[in-house]
Structure formats: C-alpha cells, structure tokens
Amino acid sequence: MRPNVLLVVLDTARADAFEPYGALAGTTPTVAQMASASNGFVHRAMYSTACWTLPAHASLFTGRLPRSAGFAKGTPPVFKHAMDAYPVDTLPDALRRAGYDTAGLSANPWISEATGFDRGFERFQMLETDRNKEMDGKRRRDRAAWLLDALRARADDGAVAIEHLLAEWLRARTKQPFFWFVNLMECHSPYLPPKPYSPAGPIGRVRAARDAARHCTLDALWRVGAGGWDIDDGALQRMRAMYDGAIRQLDAWLARVFEHLDEAHVLEDTVVIVTSDHGENFGEDHKFGHTFSLDDRLLHVPFITRGPVSIDLHAVASLADVPGALARTLGVPSGAFDDVDAPRGVAVAQLDAVGDEGDERVDAAVERWGLPESAKKFFFTSYACATDGAIKLVRRRGYEEVFVLATDPLEQAPIRMDETVDARFADELAPLRRALDAAAASEAAPIDDDADDADHDGDAGAAEVSALEKQMRLLGYL
C-alpha cells in the first residue's frame, strides 16, 4: 500500500530560522530530529516561486510557475476562477484519483474555499483562529486588538485547533492512505506567540504588538517597499524575537503531531513534509515583511521530510518541482506535472506589478508618503529571477543584473550586465537565462480582474468571503 502524506506549510517561515539551516542548537529540536533521523532528509536549496502566499501555493499544487497558469496576480475571486479553470490535475486531484483520502486544514485566509484552494480535497476547512474568536465586534476591525492579545498571551493562530482535528482524523481513519495538507499561520505577523513561547513579558509583548500594529499594515509595508524606510532597530529586534518564539511554538506543535501519528500506529507509514511558502525580512537591506522583493530571505524556504520513502528532487529545486517529484515517489500517475515549464536544477521566482502606470491609487499613495516619483517603479515593475544556489540572475524591464550569493548574501551589490560581466559568468548564466526564457515563453494570459464580478459556478459564498475578510483584518491586510 502507498504511504500516507502529511504536508505541513509553515506560512512565512524562512529557512534560516531552523536548525538544519543554521539556527542555534535547541531552537527547533523537532525539526532537527526529523533531519537527523535515518529516514529523514533536508533539502538545503529549496526555493519558493514567489514572495507571497497565493502564487507560491499555486506552484506547490500545480507544479507550474505562477504566470504559466494565470496565477500571477489578482484578488481572491480571480485566483478562485484560475484554480477552478485549471485544465489538468492539481496535486490533490492526482492523489485523490489514485485512491488517497484528501483533506486540507488551513488557518490562512488566503488558502481557503474563497480562493479555490479546496480543489481536489474531499474535505477542506479554513479555521477561525483563537485570536479571531477573542476579538469580536469593533475590536476585530481595529489593530488595537493586537495589544489586548499581547496582554493575554493565550490566543494562537489556529495551530491548536488543527492539531485536535488531525488527532480526530487519525482516530477515525480507515486503511485508505491519506494525503492531508495543513497551513499554519503562527509566524506570520503580528508575531504574537502565546505562553510559554513568547520571549517577552506583558510590557515587552505590548511593545511588540504596537510595533506590529504600526509596521505590518499593508499601507506601511508598501511604503517601506517603495523606499520609505521608517522602522527603528528596537522595533525590528522585538518583532524578530517574537517571530522566533512563534517558530519554537510550531516546532513544539510538530512534536505533538508526531506523537499523534505514533499513537495511531501510522508514523512509520507516513511521509511528513515540512516546508514554507515564503520567508520574512526583518530589516536586512532595509527590507521588511514579504513585499516587493525576490531576495533569498523570502525565497529560500525549509524543506524537511521524514518517512518511509525519499522524494527525489534536484540539488536546487523550487516548490514547483514538488508535485511531480512527490507523485513519482508515490507511484501516482504524474502526467499533469511531467510536461511543465518549471526548469530542472534551477529555481525560478516571479514578482508581478501591483498596478499599472497611471494607477490613481499608486499616485495618491506616493504623494501621501512624501516619496519621489521614482518610488512608483516599485508598484509598476514586474520581474523574475533564477538561481543555482550560488548565482542569482535578476531580469527586469529589459535589463539584467547578477548577485554572487557567497560574497553578497544580502544581495546589496548587484552587478549590472555588460560584456565583461557576461564573459566572466558565461557558464553560470547560460542555464539561468534558459530557465528565464522558458518561463517567459510559457506565460499564460492573466485572468482579467473583471473575474471579480463574474458569476462562476462554485464561487465561494458570502460566509466564506466574510470569514476571509475578517481574518485578513487581523493580519493587517485590511
């Protein structure tokens, strides 16, 4: 019988927050034990295909780069339309056809029925988090609610509820193999882990919550991305400390899930995959959050597995490689993932413009922030990058630049392309250029934003959209 699969996405978790990728010993003991187990594996050069949740998950489920299937940009209804209209099997589709029990649990409002990511799952549930439940009425619309939560230090972002559901499913399961997907939001802003994982007392937590309330709104993140840096070192340190506490919380969660698998006598028959959709910046090169950048703090994600089979991936891989590799490993028909645009041995990522030139919203925002006209380029520029883990090639607006990651890990010293540079890096650049050319050639027409108003069969209902909006407010997006 085929093995079970538990795919856990730790939203916003950067690779270097975990011991196998350089974090201090004792930071993530469960992940460290996964990596060192006789049936464990660490992929040291796994990259996301985007710097934010929706396109990254689209790649993880379809095996394609975001633009290739129309997942480049758009609102939740646009993504739902793209997922519903996707012409071949997604990973959950393929595993369901192969006889797997497919189920998903998400604490992330972006990964929900409202955005189409329930496709292929027999059961899918987006959970209302403890933090959401504790903040009712007007408070739910006010980021001051984060201050209240900071004092209480008891609410989580859905991990406990998801753990309980997994335990229930394990008790009720049949002999049918399962593919269960989980998305956890503990280390996403506002970075407020509950006791005992919080590194600060009540006063420190309130200060960290105030920092998040100021700097984690969409308006603030875009302002910083456009060059309006205004975050002091103390705020960065407080938020990073809370983020690291959330990482420890997730590591402890994984330990309990392993216990549940063991108690259900399926641990040795289950492939557990721990990864992320993207990372997070905390002031490196004056970057914060996960906007307007394809730097390695955002793209380099953890990928650790433990189980009876090993997933065959190239030494350098991206989330778009995972569906095909997993399907082949499980002996599941993988035709939907074999003839894809994602290059092998090179990781490509894409970032799309927020708006088009002349967008009045962008004009008003740049004027409100007091930034120069040149700041608008951050909103209007789409670009892509390719890396072999040592060299990163960035292509934007008709020009290329190179980063040598060994000597420039923060990517602060771009090397503009000329004949000398081209000759110096000729061997390294050739496969990266081929990858970017192939990705560009495979781009699908983007879904029109008018899809927001279209009457698509199976569109999420008012309840799902309301739940999405409610949780997005708590994350600072609205």
Please give the residue ranges for each predicted region:
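Catalytic domains that recognize anionic headgroups
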Residues: 1-478
